[in-house]
């Protein structure tokens, strides 16, 4: 791989047995810190799910160590070049699950999962009739970008997906089901759950959106918008052939791909908005959040009560 930038961002996961996640997490954090990596890694008895950044040399050492650990034999790293770190700190945390589905009866992807489709096969499958494409991510991820024709489940988090499927059975019955997510980890369990629910033709995008966007053959075609990522980059491009903006400004509905968090820390909702509207609406999604005494935009910009009142008056006048 020809390297043109000094840093890399690694994205990876593996379902494998880790006997003592707490002990492993502590040791792994010390190892990552010794390499001066930054990122967020989740560890559970069922495996590991991580994304981290570092220099080319640091990430090479990390991948070498992981590949030399028999527990992670065959692990696949998705690699992005970067100009600098994509995280501020390094966290390695033990968790009950790698992805939070909270099923009554958990799914082991080694025992049951949907059929893996490589990018070219997934591309062809999306164009077939009687196919339903389900986005297995959160609503704010979908709003920034998704495959053409994909269904956006009316959910706020991944663990709500099984209930949504049960409530919308008529949309899926008798259809070929395609599922996708950012890197593939959510679909390993979700597609397996669909198979267990009795759906016969279930496939998943192998390696997720990130792999699809890098594939030299499909080049991200049939993807609109950008892909939401859980680091300081926030969004990465997918479609190498054309860039269609699907995100809409929370306040005006105009095309927008810039995410901010609502300035009220008790809300923290992710909203798409321009820099102009961020200033106009005090980076807040509602009147209640604008007048919150903890509004971070107001505090950060040291706005006076008079300035806040003037901003609120301007918003009211524009309605």
UniProtKB/Swiss-Prot annotation:
Occurrences of domain Rhodanese (ranges): 127-221
GO biological process: tRNA modification
Enzyme Commission numbers on file: 1.14.-.-
Record has Nucleotide-binding as a keyword: no
Gene3D superfamilies: 3.30.70.100, Rhodanese-like domain
Keyword Oxidoreductase: yes
PROSITE patterns tied to this protein: RHODANESE_3
Reaction catalysed by this enzyme: uridine(34) in tRNA + AH2 + O2 = 5-hydroxyuridine(34) in tRNA + A + H2O
Keyword annotations: Oxidoreductase, tRNA processing
Annotated catalytic residues: 181
Coiled-coil regions listed in the entry: none
Pfam families: Rhodanese, Rhodanese_C, UPF0176_N
MF GO annotations: oxidoreductase activity, acting on paired donors, with incorporation or reduction of molecular oxygen
Domain of life, per lineage: Bacteria
Function comment: Catalyzes oxygen-dependent 5-hydroxyuridine (ho5U) modification at position 34 in tRNAs.
Protein family according to the UniProt entry: Belongs to the TrhO family.
Protein name: tRNA uridine(34) hydroxylase
